[in-house]
Curated annotation (Swiss-Prot):
The keyword Signal is annotated on this UniProt entry: yes
Signal sequence, renumbered to the chain: 1-19
Family the entry assigns: Belongs to the scoloptoxin-07 family.
Full protein name: Kappa-scoloptoxin(07)-Ssm2a
KW Cell division (keyword) present: no
Summary of the tissues where the protein is detected: Expressed by the venom gland.
Propeptide residue intervals: 20-41
Amino acid sequence: MLVFYALLFVTVFSNTVMGATIDKPIPKPILREAIEEIEVNKRAQNHYCKEHNCPPGKHCPKVPIACVYGPCCF
């Protein structure tokens, strides 16, 4: 009976204490998806060139670019 309790204690102790103290690494696909999602959110927040912001006679470039300062029309 004492052996049973000893095994039970070792099992519970190793699962709770050791499992709580040793952090498992984040799987690479999940980490990669999180980084891609952050990049997409950053791009969505950028202010791309919009035709209605351009002064008369100037237009946005054909390739969409993010405007840091001003409407960036050419």
